[in-house]
């Protein structure tokens, strides 16, 4: 488990920010030393064992730890679950996403789960029940302004939970949840060895079989958290109908709908499934991107398509160990035009967002061209076009002429299309050209190749960062290097149409930031620097990793600045915490204090928002 | 002596025959020369004599190639220049310059190749320059080298750097101007301008039904307001594409996404066949007569478009094997041309605009935070001389705008 320093710092500070100093100190120790028992933690962190246990308890509750019991000593050893710790920063985004797709009720449940950590369903139900009772008994007739509850009944809670579980946003905790991936893998290895290969593995064939069995075992472990979902799917007769109600629960979904949901096993412990949440966030990001490149109507269509498509995608990046060997799973899901059409709101005008031109100047065959196969893994950034599609072109242009002449006869210069056809226009636009948002994989079937698409988006993000640091000329030079490979200064100069002085200055600038690098190629054994050839090149992977580190570091800085501000305004903040002041700060505090208080809140909001925005970049670079 | 006369005649005949058979770049082998049927009975000895005389008179230039000796002819004027030179040193220097052709030759190269004393070579060059046979030139690739070229030749594109150079300097102003024009051209040709205009076409809703109704009787209220188009419509098919598209989109556009009255660029449907190609752009530039004293070849324009592509401003789209270009991030593009934007730009309103082409890069959180542009980022650490807690950039970022706000509120 290698974690870069910046990430470790960031996670520790996030824990500090959310759960206080004690857990943060324990966490920092774990980051520094790796897997530790309670005794060792207390030794290294100079905390008493009791304090350490308290800290661990909080961390465990929020799923921020892995633990395993050492077979020899019988002591539990703890290590950090840094992915989960980092995901804390996405809390806001996840809540917003749930709010958008499942309404405020869904968000409320999600929020409580985030606050509580993993929770037994019965506890959650009891807590809500208490709240509902409180409001109902609290002299409802006396107090007009009783707080509006997002969840009004147990049945509704149950139904919301069912929705979220079906969407995989919530999953179940099982015995292996608290083991690190590595630990689980080791265990599965051992089991497989014991059961099938007691005599050891001999030969390549056995090796392959061994790997398959391990992958199978791992998959089984992974599936365990989906038990509730499966159960729901089994008596899922109602789920079809229910889907119609999704999103409308705010306007009081009909009671009977809720009754149809099977009661969830109250003993199950649930938690938020970040993997799936990240899938949803990725879709959001993609839609944003389409909004920028092609327009909002197309972006909306794309959003609907992704919603359909990602229903059965549980994680953004497939595990090389588990998923490599299952070709049947690899068949990417696709959606048909009609499926999308069913979901598009009737209020959306699909004629918007695309220019209207006579169909004469559109080549139908080119637009409708099918690409049934996913693109091969090409070397990223090397010149990708011009390669494979030329031979087919000849055939197409012929049939094209025919089509055009036919079109001309019917004298409607601008084709007025039916709604499905309008929708198709958006999808075709998405499918055309770079960066391949959608692949038209069959007649009226659409799919998305996430891997190359995300690779392209990553490059775009890097480009925009380069453009902001080094200007458009810097971007130009980097993109030339990316497409052409290593280049000498002369070649670079003639390709970029830049003055030698400007070019050298720009390259130097980018060399310092780490976007570009030089390589020295000596002409002879003496390696005389005067005679050596110097080549410029850019290492994109390295640029990514340095950017990722920078993102973490910037978040750390934001949190540190926030802490400094908090210290500075300590007196005001402690005043605002007093129960008689809380909620009516403006009236109770002196003007000067209130101004400081408001300023602090503003700064806090700004810094938090900034962190979320940095997370946008970071997530794109490493998680999507 | 009859023999000598005969050789004289043969010499002239062979020279003329060689001239007829190719340019002064063509190399003739012995076989080629014999096949011209000038030398009687394929007499090799005679041919040798004739060629020797031609070479002496500088009318033929000998070459050694992989397949053996060969010759090419030289014009009589040039030959005369050679023969008029006083001594062989000067002749050799002139020959070197002559060989180098339009690329020119570096004086050090002449010196090294001829193994000549410095002073002697200088003397030769001076003589030749005075005579007006050679001239010094500048090469953009090696601006510090002293180069010479035959006086009656124009330096090659490689030496001058092609159309992008003026007097050995890269003409960035010219390039930039031209880029803007090309960019505007591509923008205009690859997008659709939706005038989110106010001309109300009532009830042109989203529903397919509405659209179909329009299809049936297009005379009703489809056309955008001010100018009466009805005659045009009755003519039916004769309308231009621009007009047609106007009446169709102008109305629905303001419904949701656009602020009324503001034109907006929209992408064209997939499979659009007329995205401008490089040759389209070259034609446009040629006809517009923007570059009246330089001719730009298609390759030059390609270079220009490539730079736009590397800048992330345009992207290639392939439709039926035809590689056209369109601008990127269409909805964000400003419908005005670069020049218009420059004129409209108010420098007092702050913000240094480096380019009027395209769109600002999309904002990223990292660059917005002070750390993204921090010059001392690498040494910033809590406890160090520069740390987040004493960071001036953060202070400015968080407090700076508040100071401004207060000023405004007063």
UniProtKB/Swiss-Prot annotation, chain A:
GO cellular component: RNA polymerase III complex
GO molecular function terms attached to this record: single-stranded DNA binding
Source taxon at top rank: Eukaryota
Disordered as annotated region, ranges: 229-260, 373-418
Keywords carried by this UniProt record: DNA-directed RNA polymerase, Nucleus, Transcription, Zinc
Short name of any one Pfam family annotated for the protein: HTH_9
Stretches the record annotates as Leucine-zipper: 551-572
Primary localization class, coarse: nucleus
Subcellular location: Nucleus
Any single biological process term in GO: DNA-templated transcription
Record InterPro entries: POLR3C_WHD, RNA_pol_III_RPC82-rel_HTH, RNA_pol_III_Rpc82_C, RPC3, WH-like_DNA-bd_sf
Compositionally biased region (Acidic residues): 385-403
Assembly behavior: Component of the RNA polymerase III (Pol III) complex consisting of 17 subunits.
Similarity comment: family membership: Belongs to the RNA polymerase beta chain family.
Biological role: DNA-dependent RNA polymerase catalyzes the transcription of DNA into RNA using the four ribonucleoside triphosphates as substrates. Specific core component of RNA polymerase III which synthesizes small RNAs, such as 5S rRNA and tRNAs.
Name of the protein in its database record: DNA-directed RNA polymerase III subunit rpc-3
Protein species of origin: Neurospora crassa (strain ATCC 24698 / 74-OR23-1A / CBS 708.71 / DSM 1257 / FGSC 987)
UniProt gene name: rpc-82
């Amino acid at each position: 488990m290698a974690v870069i320093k910046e990430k470790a710092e960031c996670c520790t500070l996030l824990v500090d920010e959310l759960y206080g100093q004690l857990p943060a100190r324990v966490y920092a120790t774990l980051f520094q030393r790796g897997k530790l028992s309670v005794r060792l933690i207390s030794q290294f962190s100079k905390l008493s064992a009791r304090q350490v246990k308290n800290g661990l308890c909080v961390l465990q509750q929020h799923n921020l730890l892995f633990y395993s019991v050492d077979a020899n000593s019988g002591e539990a050893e703890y290590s950090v679950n840094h992915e989960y710790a980092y995901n804390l920063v996405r809390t806001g985004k996840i809540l917003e996403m749930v709010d958008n797709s499942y309404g405020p009720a869904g968000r409320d449940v999600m929020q409580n789960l985030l606050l509580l950590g993993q929770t037994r369903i019965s506890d959650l139900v009891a807590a809500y029940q208490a709240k509902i009772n409180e409001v109902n008994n609290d002299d409802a007739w006396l107090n007009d302004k009783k707080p509006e509850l997002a969840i009004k009944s147990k049945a509704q809670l149950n139904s919301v939970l069912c929705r979220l579980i079906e969407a995989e946003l919530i999953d179940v905790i099982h015995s292996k949840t608290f083991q690190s991936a590595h630990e689980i893998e080791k265990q599965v290895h051992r089991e497989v060895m014991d059961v099938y290969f007691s005599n050891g593995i001999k030969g390549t064939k056995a090796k392959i079989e061994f790997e398959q069995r391990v992958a199978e075992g791992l998959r089984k472990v992974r599936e365990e958290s989906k038990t509730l979902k499966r159960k729901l799917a089994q008596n899922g007769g109602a789920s079809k109908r229910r889907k119609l109600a999704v999103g409308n629960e705010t306007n009081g979904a009909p009671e009977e709908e809720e009754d149809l949901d099977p009661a969830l096993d109250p003993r199950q412990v649930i938690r938020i499934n970040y993997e799936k949440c990240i899938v949803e966030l990725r879709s959001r990001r993609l839609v944003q991107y389409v909004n920028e490149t092609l327009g909002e109507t197309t972006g909306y269509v794309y959003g609907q398509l992704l919603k359909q498509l990602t229903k059965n995608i549980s994680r953004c990046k497939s595990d090389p160990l588990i998923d490599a060997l299952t070709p049947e799973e690899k068949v990417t899901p696709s959606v048909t035009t009609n499926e999308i059409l069913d979901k598009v709101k009737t209020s959306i005008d699909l004629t918007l967002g695309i220019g209207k031109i006579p169909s004469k100047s559109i080549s139908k065959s080119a637009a409708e061209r099918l690409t049934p196969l996913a693109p091969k893994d090409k070397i990223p950034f090397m010149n990708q076009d011009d390669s494979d599609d030329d031979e087919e072109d000849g055939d197409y242009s012929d049939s094209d002429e025919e089509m055009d002449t036919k079109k001309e006869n019917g004298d409607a210069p601008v084709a007025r299309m039916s709604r499905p056809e309008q929708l198709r226009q958006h999808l075709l636009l998405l499918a055309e050209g770079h960066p391949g948002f959608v692949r038209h994989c069959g007649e009226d079937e659409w799919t998305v190749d996430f891997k190359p698409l995300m690779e392209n988006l990553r490059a775009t993000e890097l480009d925009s960062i380069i453009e902001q640091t080094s200007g458009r000329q810097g971007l130009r030079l980097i993109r030339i290097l990316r497409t052409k490979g290593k280049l000498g200064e002369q070649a670079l100069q003639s390709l970029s149409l830049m003055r030698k002085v400007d070019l050298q200055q720009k390259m130097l600038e980018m060399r310092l930031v780490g976007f570009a690098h030089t390589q020295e190629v000596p002409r002879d054994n003496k390696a005389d620097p005067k005679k050596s050839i110097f080549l410029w090149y850019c290492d994109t992977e390295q640029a990514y990793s340095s950017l990722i580190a920078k993102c973490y570091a910037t978040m750390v800085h934001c949190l540190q600045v926030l802490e400094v501000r908090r210290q500075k305004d300590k007196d005001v903040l402690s005043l605002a915490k007093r129960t008689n002041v809380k909620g009516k700060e403006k009236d109770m505090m002196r003007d000067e204090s209130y101004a400081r208080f408001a300023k602090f809140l503003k700064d806090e909001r700004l810094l938090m928002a900034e962190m979320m925005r940095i997370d946008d970049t970071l997530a794109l670079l490493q998680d999507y | 002596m009859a023999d000598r006369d005969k050789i004289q005649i043969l010499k002239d005949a062979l020279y003329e025959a060689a001239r007829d058979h190719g340019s002064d770049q063509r190399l003739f082998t012995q076989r080629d020369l014999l096949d011209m049927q000038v030398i009687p009975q394929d007499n090799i000895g005679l041919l040798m004599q004739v060629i020797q005389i031609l070479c002496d008179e500088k009318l033929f230039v000998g070459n050694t190639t992989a397949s053996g000796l060969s010759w090419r002819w030289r014009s009589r004027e040039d030959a005369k220049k050679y023969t008029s030179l006083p001594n062989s040193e000067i002749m050799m220097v002139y020959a070197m310059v002559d060989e180098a052709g339009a690329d020119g030759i570096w004086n050090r190269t002449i010196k090294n190749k001829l193994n000549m004393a410095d002073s002697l070579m200088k003397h030769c060059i001076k003589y030749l320059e005075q005579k007006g046979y050679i001239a010094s030139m500048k090469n953009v690739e090696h601006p510090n080298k002293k180069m010479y070229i035959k006086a009656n030749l124009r330096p090659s594109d490689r030496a001058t750097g092609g159309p992008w150079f003026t007097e050995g300097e890269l003409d960035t102003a010219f390039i930039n101007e031209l880029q803007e024009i090309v960019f505007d051209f591509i923008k205009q040709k690859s997008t659709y301008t939706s005038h989110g205009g106010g001309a109300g076409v009532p009830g042109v809703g989203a529903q397919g039904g509405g659209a179909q109704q329009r299809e049936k009787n297009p005379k009703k209220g489809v056309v955008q307001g001010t100018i009466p188009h009805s005659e045009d419509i009755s003519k039916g098919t004769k309308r231009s594409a621009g007009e047609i598209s106007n009446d169709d989109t102008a109305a629905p556009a303001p419904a949701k996404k656009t602020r009324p009255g503001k034109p907006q660029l929209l992408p064209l449907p997939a499979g659009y066949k007329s995205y401008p190609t490089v040759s389209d752009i070259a034609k446009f530039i040629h006809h517009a007569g923007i570059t009246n004293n330089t001719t730009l070849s298609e390759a030059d324009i390609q270079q220009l478009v490539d730079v736009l592509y590397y800048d992330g401003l345009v992207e290639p789209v392939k439709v039926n094997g035809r590689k056209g270009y369109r601008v990127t991030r269409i909805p964000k593009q400003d419908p005005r041309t670069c020049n218009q934007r420059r004129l409209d730009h108010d420098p007092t309103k702050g913000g240094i605009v480096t380019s009027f082409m395209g769109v600002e890069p999309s904002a990223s959180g990292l660059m917005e935070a002070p750390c993204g542009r921090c010059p001392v980022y690498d040494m910033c650490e809590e406890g160090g001389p520069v740390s987040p807690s004493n960071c001036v950039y953060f202070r400015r970022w968080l407090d700076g705008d508040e100071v401004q706000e207060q000023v405004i509120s007063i």
